[in-house]
Design a protein with these regions (language model features):
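Solvent-exposed beta-hairpin/edge-strand motifs
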Residues: 364-378
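C-terminal beta-strand-rich structural cap/linker in extracellular carbohydrate-active enzymes
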Residues: 379-402
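Carbohydrate-binding surface patches
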Residues: 331-367
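Substrate-binding surface in catalytic domains of secreted glycosidases
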Residues: 211, 218-249, 257-273, 278-279
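Well-ordered, non-membrane alpha-helical segments in soluble/globular domains
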Residues: 19-25, 54-63, 120-122, 164-170, ...
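Aromatic/acidic polysaccharide-binding cleft in carbohydrate-active enzymes
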Residues: 251-335
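Substrate-binding cleft and catalytic face of glycoside hydrolase catalytic domains
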Residues: 32-211, 215-221
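Boundary/entry segment of secreted carbohydrate-active catalytic domains
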Residues: 1-42
Length: 402
């Protein structure tokens, strides 16, 4: 993960606890196989793994570790979050329908001071030293670590930004000392909260860098990708403004909508299929400091199958793995173009019309184009130089001879 050209690990899937992958002991069944697994919501949170002082329940993590070991090569992201109720400064109610305050707490640990939380440090130490009964160890398989899921939302964290920094400052060296090659991401904020993440970066700048990556979560939320990329731009601009221009950035959690993980009914099926591809391409191509996205992760992976998107995701990965985008996507009206160099060395251009069907005249050096057609891998059509070609909401990729 974290490379240009794009690798398979630059995509990730997440298996929500109780769905048909992850803690039930089953691997994802899609033909498309992202190279990274993100463990958030897989039943491996702090509150679940550390259910009492000095007591650990590793069952769910062991299931994931053993599955990951069986499906190599594979990168893994662990995201901290969900404070345990036994350590909460605000007591959990133990009732109600909301998980926050019932099964876990958003409040800081009771033992958190300006020098950290001994209980959190103990959990982190136990976590990075843990191995499953089959001998599959955290230190060998989990190399990417996110500091606290969406802490700008008070149902995930209701302490101050400074308190969160204080909790992680002594914990990050524990990870680095036990996990060779560990990479740390900022706490991934949601909803384009540039003010929160700017305050976090200011703390790192003033008191010591903790992060190797800059992470956030941006869902489409019923917007077209061509509109939603503006929020990505705002987040990347905030990174650069705070002196982090060369820091790689990641959108480690996305989908259509947060609440349903479904494409809006305002769009046609063809548009929804195209949006999966357009959303990823726009991010991987966005050249806003440190190049395009180093990672894009899809939340609730079974929604790829239930939505009928597996052939599109698979074909997209086939197109982009090994490729390097040479510039951000640009638009002329509703027609978007994204230049790239493929793994083969061919010069290519991804093109679509977000508004629907139209004609497009490619430059004369393009001699064929790849398209999505509902099959794994799609199809390739040969064209004569400068041939007028039909485009639409599903991207096509023009290619040169080499």
């Amino acid at each position: 993960m974290g490379s240009h050209p794009i690798e398979a690990t630059n995509w990730s899937f997440e298996c929500v606890n109780g769905t048909d992958c992850g803690s039930n002991g089953l691997w994802i069944t899609t033909t498309s196989q992202p190279g990274t697994m993100r463990l958030w919501d897989s039943g491996t949170s702090w509150a679940i793994l550390n259910n009492a002082a000095g007591t650990y329940s590793w069952t769910n993590l062991d299931i994931s570790l053993d599955l990951i070991a069986e499906h190599q090569p594979r990168a893994v992201i662990y995201t901290f979050g969900h404070g345990p109720c036994w350590l909460a400064s605000t007591a959990c109610s133990g009732s109600g329908s909301a998980s926050s305050g019932k099964y876990w707490s958003p409040s800081p640990p009771t033992d958190l001071t300006t020098t950290g939380s001994p209980s959190f440090n103990a959990f982190v130490t136990a976590l990075v030293q843990h191995c499953s009964p089959a001998g599959h160890c955290v230190k060998d398989y989990i190399k990417y670590w996110e500091m606290w899921n969406e802490p700008n939302l008070t149902h995930y964290w209701n302490g101050s930004i400074a308190q969160l920094y204080n909790m992680f400052k002594p914990a990050i060296p524990i990870i680095r000392n036990h996990v060779t090659g560990a990479k740390i991401s900022t706490p991934p904020v949601s909803g384009g909260d540039t003010a929160w993440i700017a305050s976090w970066m200011a703390l790192e700048n003033a008191n010591g860098r903790l992060s190797d990556y800059y992470g956030f979560h941006v869902y489409l939320w019923n917007y077209a990708p061509e509109t939603r990329i503006n929020m990505i731009g705002h987040m990347v601009t905030a990174k650069n403004t705070n002196g982090w221009t060369t820091t790689p950035w990641m959108n480690t959690e996305t989908n259509f909508s947060v609440d349903t993980n479904l494409c809006s009914t305002q769009y046609t099926k063809a548009d929804c299929e195209g949006q999966i591809v357009r959303w990823h391409v726009l991010q991987f191509a966005y050249q806003g400091g440190a190049g395009g996205a180093f990672h894009v992760g899809w939340y609730n992976w079974p929604s790829i199958s239930s939505g009928g998107y597996d052939t599109y995701y698979y074909t997209m990965m086939q197109w982009l793995t090994g490729a390097t985008f040479t510039a951000s996507c640009t638009s002329s009206g509703t027609v978007w173009t994204c230049p790239l160099t493929e793994a083969s060395g061919k010069t290519a251009l991804i093109v679509w019309n977000a508004a629907g069907d139209s004609d497009y005249t490619p430059a004369t050096e393009y001699l064929d184009y790849k398209k999505f057609n509902g099959t794994y891998g799609g199809a390739t059509e040969t064209i004569s130089a400068g041939k007028v070609t039909a485009i639409g909401v599903s991207p096509i990729m023009f290619e040169t001879a080499k």
